[in-house]
Regions:
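Short, Lys/Arg-enriched N-terminal segments with co-localized hydrophobic residues
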Residues: 1-16
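Soluble "head" domains of membrane/secretory-pathway proteins
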Residues: 12-24, 39, 43-49, 56-201
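Generic secretory/membrane-interface signal
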Residues: 2-4, 35, 124
Length: 201
């Protein structure tokens, strides 16, 4: 009878060990997935829901989009330490995600209109760069802006950005600084995945 009890105990112990091994295997899988998702979200992608109409008709209120963090290089806050490596700079007409200059806890999404060192003028609903008589071609805007702005010279390390919905956008025309610095740019808007898939440009 002693050997029977001992045998039962061994079987029970093996069973418990097997169950714990399976639980640990699942736990490891979950940990790995969480780490990968966290790394992708913090290093590669920006996952955002659009809260306002400022980029209509290109991006609508409620759209869910991915931004690509590595489009211009690496700009990462790693446990309070900033890691930054620039590969390329934003170009005119790029739609960028950035820290709002007047409150860096907020992130904004707008279109790059003027580049570092350029002078921008918004007059009679059109945008002019560096005193050109020819206005920018902007087929993406919802409607022409009612108010004039400028001329304004963008600082050396800055970008002048506006929303596509020109009359309903809190953008560089309204801000205290009137520009986004290169270091505040987090990434480039990539594609919308909800309510339908669309490449953003």
């Amino acid at each position: 009878s002693f050997s029977v009890k001992s045998s039962k105990r061994k079987i029970l112990r093996r069973l418990i060990m097997r169950i714990w091994k399976e639980i640990w295997d699942y736990a490891k899988m979950i940990i790995i997935v969480v780490v990968i998702v966290t790394l992708v979200n913090s290093v590669v992608l920006i996952n955002a829901k659009i809260p306002s109409e400022s980029m209509e008709k290109t991006i609508m209120t409620g759209d869910r989009i991915f931004g690509f963090r590595l489009a211009y290089g690496l700009n990462l806050d790693f446990f309070g330490h900033e890691i930054s490596k620039k590969i390329k700079d934003p170009e005119r007409f790029d739609i960028v995600i950035f820290k709002y200059p007047d409150d860096e806890t907020e992130w904004f999404i707008k279109r790059v209109i003027a580049l570092p060192g350029e002078t921008v003028l918004v007059k009679d609903g059109k945008v002019y760069i560096n005193g050109s008589k020819k206005a920018l071609s902007e087929p993406y805007i919802k409607e022409e802006p009612v108010e004039d702005f400028g001329p304004y010279k963008v600082p050396k390390n800055g970008y002048f950005v506006m929303g596509d919905n020109r009359n309903n956008s809190n953008d560089a025309r309204e801000w205290e600084t009137h520009y986004v610095s290169r270091d505040e740019v987090l990434g480039k808007a990539w594609f919308r995945y909800y309510p339908s898939i669309k490449v953003i440009k």
